[in-house]
Amino acid sequence: MNFHIGNEVWWEDPDNNGLRSGAYEVVDIDRDNDVLTLSNGSSIVEAFSDECVFPSEYLYNS
């Protein structure tokens, strides 16, 4: 996947029938360690791998 600072990652709320509950911006991209940091402080690892799988609660929105 191709990420840029400012891309949005939506949060899906499993307690609300999976509806989108908000979005977090990508605030840091660490390509050397293959990690994205979101504005809520969470990290997504292996973000640039072909096998990248977002945690089930997140949906990528380019």
Per-segment meaning from a language model:
Residues 1-15:
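Short coil-to-beta transition motif at edge beta-strands of beta-rich domains
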Residues 12-48:
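Basic/aromatic-rich interaction segments and small domains that mediate binding to polyanionic partners
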Residues 9, 16-17, 30, 54, ...:
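A generic structural signal for solvent-exposed, polar alpha-helical segments
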